[in-house]
From Swiss-Prot:
This is G1/S-specific cyclin-D1. One of its GO terms (cellular component) is microtubule organizing center. Residues 273-282 have a biased composition (Acidic residues). Interacts with either CDK4 or CDK6 protein kinase to form a serine/threonine kinase holoenzyme complex. The cyclin subunit imparts substrate specificity to the complex. Component of the ternary complex CCND1/CDK4/CDKN1B required for nuclear translocation and modulation of CDK4-mediated kinase activity. Interacts directly with CDKN1B. Can form similar complexes with either CDKN1A or CDKN2A. Interacts with UHRF2; the interaction ubiquitinates CCND1 and appears to occur independently of phosphorylation. Interacts with USP2. The modification Phosphothreonine is found at T286. It comes from the Eukaryota. It comes from Canis lupus familiaris.
């Protein structure tokens, strides 16, 4: 044929229309209550784990984030997988040789919960450089869901972001960029052990405040001023405003440290590695779009 047909259609994920009934106060109250039932222990490194160190968790968490990004998983998959990881480590001692297997299993289950086409066991084994087998992953999956008592629909910070945005008088184009930046902060927080003690609602609220601050939106909208937005969100999630400010400042400090180490690594990889060894929590890797945030 002289003229070939050119198909320009792009496959898009089919999503349900937004339902305002799912964003009302009754649902938010239920979510705030539900997040308490899926909280990990904040002291599992001292009380439960004998071989696993925070730095090891950081390495596995960064690897999990990279896998989720490369596979273009839904934003909720990685935080949900980290919730499973933290809760399992709160209950069961794990040998360091099996930590990557646990991380892969957590992604495997989380993708089943959030993806229309979940990650396969074979694909996850490839990402471990075939250090684990599919049958090992399936066995660990059974152990994981039993230890978690099949309570797999855990609340994550992403569940709260939409509630906050729906209550904020902000233009839709600004909501989209706030959402994207807040999601990036959530992913960054999930890799750091210091945020295990913060409930998902507080991480979400702190991420939204940090996103608004970084985008300098408070100058054009008085509602988005730092103190007013912090007071508003603290009332929404029923927490002390000072606690929310502390969480938001911790997020910004984590971002700055992550950016600084990423820049050092690009200029002097050896010096960056030495600095990582000095810190218990390795913050060298940054999630997508973090470098676009200005604070």
């Amino acid at each position: 044929m002289a003229h070939q047909l050119l198909c320009c259609e792009v496959e898009t994920i089919r999503r349900a229309y937004p339902d305002a009934n799912l964003l009302n106060d009754r649902v938010l109250r239920a979510m705030l209550k539900a997040e308490e039932t899926c909280a990990p222990s904040v002291s599992y490194f001292k009380c439960v784990q004998k071989e696993i160190l925070p730095s090891m968790r950081k390495i596995v968490a960064t690897w999990m984030l990279e896998v989720c990004e490369e596979q273009k998983c839904e934003e909720e998959v990685f935080p949900l997988a980290m919730n499973y990881l933290n809760r399992f480590l709160s209950l069961e001692p794990v040998k360091k040789s099996r930590l990557q297997l646990l991380g892969a299993t957590c992604m495997f289950v989380a993708s089943k919960m959030k993806e229309t086409i979940p990650l396969t066991a074979e694909k996850l084994c490839i990402y471990t450089d075939n250090s684990i087998r599919p049958d090992e992953l399936l066995q660990m999956e059974l152990l994981l869901v039993n230890k978690l008592k099949w309570n797999l629909a855990a609340m994550t910070p992403h569940d709260f972001i939409e509630h906050f945005l729906s209550k904020m008088p902000v233009a839709e184009e600004n909501k989209q960029i706030i959402r994207k930046h807040a999601q990036t902060f959530v992913a960054l927080c999930a890799t750091d052990v210091k945020f295990i003690s913060n409930p998902p609602s507080m991480v979400a609220a702190g991420s939204v405040v940090a996103a608004v601050q970084g985008l300098h939106l408070g100058s054009s909208n008085s509602f988005l001023s730092y103190h007013r937005l912090t007071r508003f969100l603290s009332k929404v999630i029923k927490c002390d405003a000072d606690c929310l400010r502390a969480c938001q400042e911790q997020i910004e400090a984590l971002l700055e440290s992550s950016l600084r180490q990423a820049q050092q690594q690009s200029l002097d990889p050896k010096a960056a590695e030495e600095e990582e060894e000095e810190e218990e929590a390795d913050l060298a890797c940054t999630p997508t779009d973090v470098r676009d945030v200005n604070i």
